A protein has these predicted regions:
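Accessory RNA-recognition modules of RNA-modification enzymes
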Residues: 1-173
Length: 173
């Protein structure tokens, strides 16, 4: 159906443990599943196939084509270390709770997992709260808006996801 390295456009319809969006593609009598890192329900995304198996594929997010209806606009700039920054905290909580409960139910075989669940423990503040921050300096700046790389620049910020040499400059709050 697909091959490794192919770029596809899919609509994410559910969420899996570990921050992966799930897209289902009709394949005869069954469905072919595509797991897309850092995508969530309601988004239409462009993704590159990394791993191809018989019943499923794993893909890396390239671009969000259509945002989900629940996404909100914030004053914060996008950074690769916070892919769910634009998802309201109550939606994040719901996704994480259902993912956790379904994982424990599937592994344990116990179907009434909700009766054992005490609840979601929230962070003191949804924003401006981090357990740890690690900033990097680099002479290679990744420009977030255009996707370009600027060599010979001075950049202070977060490392671009999947790289150790590129930094996304922090120029907004």
């Amino acid at each position: 159906m697909f091959h490794r390295g192919e770029v596809i456009t899919v609509t994410i319809d559910s969420y899996a443990f570990g921050g992966r969006g799930i897209a289902r593609i009709p394949n005869g009598d069954s469905q072919f599943i595509v797991f897309v890192d850092n995508a969530f329900p309601g988004q239409t995304v462009k993704a590159k196939i990394d791993v191809k198996r018989k019943q499923h594929a794993e893909a890396k997010l390239i671009e969000v084509i259509t945002r989900a209806a629940c996404e909100k606009v914030t004053d914060f700039q996008e950074i690769s270390g916070a892919p769910y920054l634009f998802v309201p905290i109550d939606v994040q909580r719901s996704m994480k709770t259902s993912s956790t409960l379904s994982t424990f139910s599937r592994i344990s075989g116990f179907q009434a997992m909700e009766s054992c669940f005490d609840g979601y423990i929230e962070a003191p503040e949804p924003y401006f709260y981090r357990n740890k921050m690690e900033y990097s300096f680099s002479s290679i700046e990744h420009l977030i808006e255009s996707g370009e790389e600027k060599d010979g620049a001075f950049a202070l910020g977060f490392k671009r996801r999947g790289t150790w040499w590129k930094v996304e400059n922090l120029n907004r709050p």
